[in-house]
Each structure stands twice: as structure tokens, then as C-alpha cells.
Amino acid sequence: MDYTPRLQPARLIKRYKRFLADVVTPEGETLTLHCANTGAMTGCATPGDTVWYSTSDNPKRKYPQSWELTETQQNHWICVNTLRANTLLYEALLENRIEELAGYSDIKTEVKYGTENSRIDLLLQAPDRIDCYIEVKSVTLLQHECGYFPDAVTLRGQKHLRELQQMVSNGKRAVLFFAVLHSGIQQVSPARHIDSRYAELFIEAQQAGVEILCYGSTLCPDGIKLTNKLPLLG
């Protein structure tokens, strides 16, 4: 996924009200950015970090600039815009870069499914294959050399695990796809220390046949791309 035009840098002053962040540009201008990340953003929003932002040409937006990347003071790159994960996987599927998900001729997005009023991120279909339901999660929390999901208690994430497990029970294929959008993360684990119920449901879903895939990425102000498969820790 290319950033066009290229992202612009600023220094983070603070993030507040979950969806807003104040930054100062190299020219000394203070801007308020929109933040599309509803999580805790632990380690992704330290004052003094370099923020890379995009600018929308939509005149109706109150905050035209969006926080896309963080370049931390430890020299890690992080995509904090969680909306990008779905786009990255969609592009990778079109280019047949995810071996485990190759061979499908049709990709649908935001399709209603399940019994808890859910929408699946991606639905893969082909005449000779079982429908494949994919839920995409962005992983940005780095602790003790491991990436964890979630970074805060997530009732929505718990619901998605139940829905995926139900799809397997219905004879479908179900995949939980972790898009690792932090350059320092080399392995992934469910965050039992943050959301113990999510971790329990994760194990239940995995044992029921829900597939877990973890892929790393390359990140820079020109663009981001899913790259290599990463190991999953139990």
C-alpha cells in the first residue's frame, strides 16, 4: 500500500480523547490529527515520538490530517491506523502473496455473518473451495520481544472469536489473521495478561479448527506491505 502523497512528519505532543493527537511540525506549526486507533496504543504514542501523517482533500473533515505511522525513539516503525490492516491483506491476496489463502477467485468485504450481528472483514470464495471467513487484527503492542493482541480488553474481539468458531461448526473455513504492523515484533501471542477471556476464547477457537496466521510487514513513509510469516506462541 503506497502513501500518495508521501506522509509528512511531526513531533507528538500528546494523544487525548482516544481519537485526537496534538503534534508540532518541523516548521513549528501545531496540528490536531485524527487517530483511527481505539486501542490503548501502549508504546505507540510516547510524547516526543515522530508521527507521520496523511492529509485528506475532503473539505468536510474537521480534522483533515490522519495519524498513520509512529517512528519511536527506539527506532521502531508502527502503523497506528488500524483501518490499514484490512487493505494490506486485501492487496496481498490480490497479488497471491499469502500462500495459505491462495486459490480463491472472489474476495468480498464487510459481509454480514454469524449470529451476533457481525460483519466479516474478508470472505474468500471459489467454485471448488469451501467459503473462507477472515477476521483481520492489527498487532502493535510490543512487550518482552513479543507482540501481543489485544492491547486492551476487547468484547468485540471476543465476539469475533465466537463467530469464527461457529463458522467452523457450520462447515466453513475460518481464519484469524494477525497483521503485525510494528517493526520490532518477531512473534505473536494472545495477551492473557490484558484480556484473559479473549485468550481463553482464542484457545477454544484454535482447538475447534479456526486457523491462525501471523504476518509481519515493512513500514516507511512511502508505504507499507505485508511480507513474511511470523511464529505464533501459545
From Swiss-Prot:
GO terms for molecular function: DNA binding. InterPro entries: SfsA, SfsA_C, SfsA_N. Belongs to the SfsA family. This is Sugar fermentation stimulation protein homolog. It comes from Pectobacterium atrosepticum (strain SCRI 1043 / ATCC BAA-672) (Erwinia carotovora subsp. atroseptica). The gene is sfsA.
